[in-house]
Design a protein with these regions (language model features):
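Hydrophobic transmembrane alpha-helical segments of multi-pass transport and channel proteins
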Residues: 18-22, 104, 149
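Membrane-interface segments at transmembrane helix junctions and kinks
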Residues: 1-10, 14-15, 43-56, 75-101, ...
Length: 188
C-alpha cells in the first residue's frame, strides 16, 4: 500500500495484519505444543476433535487473513485493492497481481486448516496424548481473535475513512517542489 501512495491504508493494514498474523503464529504454537513439538503437517490430522479452541481461533485468523467479509482483513485488503485499481496506467495490472496473491494466500491458509484440523489422522504419533493448550496460551489467542474480528471495523474510519485526512495531515505530505514520483512511471 505504501508503494501505491496509500500510506494511511498501509498503516491501517499494518494494524489489522498484526492481529491476525500474530493469532495465526500463536495458534500454530498452540498446535505444536498440543502435539508435543511435532511440526510436520503431514503427520497431523483430525486435530479439531482434540483441540477445538485452537481450531476455532485459527479459523478466525485464517478468515481474517483471506479477507472474509467483515473480518479485519476484509477492510484493509479491500482498501489496498481499491488503491491499486485507482492507479493510472498500471492500475489494472497491479490489481490483478494483488488479487492473484490474495487467492494464493487463501489457498495455502485453507490448506493448512483442512489438513491439520479436519484431515485424516495418519497415525504418526500417539493420538491420545494430543491435548488443548492451557489458559496461559489460550487467553492471548482470545484477545488476538477479538482484534482479528473487530480491529478492521474499529480503526477503519480513523485510519482510512473520512476522518483520516485530519489524522494524517502534517505527517505525510508531498511537497510541490518534489516531482521524483513522475519518473517512476517512466521506468515502469
Amino acid at each position: 500500500a505504501c508503494g501505491l501512495g496509500a500510506f494511511n491504508v498501509a498503516i491501517f493494514h499494518l494494524i489489522t495484519h498484526g492481529y491476525f498474523k500474530a493469532l495465526l503464529f500463536l495458534s500454530s504454537g498452540s498446535v505444536i505444543h498440543g502435539v508435543h513439538d511435532e511440526q510436520d503437517m503431514d503427520k497431523m490430522g483430525n486435530l479439531f476433535s482434540k483441540m477445538k479452541i485452537t481450531s476455532i481461533v485459527m479459523w478466525i485468523g485464517t478468515l481474517a487473513i483471506v479477507g472474509f467479509p467483515f473480518m479485519s482483513g476484509y477492510y484493509s485488503k479491500d482498501l489496498i485493492l481499491n488503491a491499486s485499481f485507482n492507479l493510472y496506467e498500471l492500475g489494472s495490472l497491479v490489481y490483478i497481481l494483488l488479487a492473484i496473491i490474495s487467492a494464493m494466500t487463501a489457498f495455502y491458509s485453507f490448506r493448512l486448516i483442512f489438513k491439520v484440523f479436519h484431515g485424516k489422522y495418519n497415525g504418526s504419533f500417539d493420538y491420545e496424548k494430543i491435548h488443548e493448550s492451557n489458559y496461559v496460551m489460550l487467553v492471548p489467542l482470545f484477545i488476538l481473535s477479538f482484534g482479528s474480528i473487530f480491529a478492521g471495523y474499529f480503526f477503519n474510519e480513523i485510519l482510512s475513512g473520512n476522518y483520516s485526512f485530519d489524522f494524517w495531515r502534517g505527517v505525510i505530505f508531498l511537497s510541490q517542489d518534489e516531482h521524483h514520483y513522475s519518473s517512476i512511471y517512466t521506468v515502469l
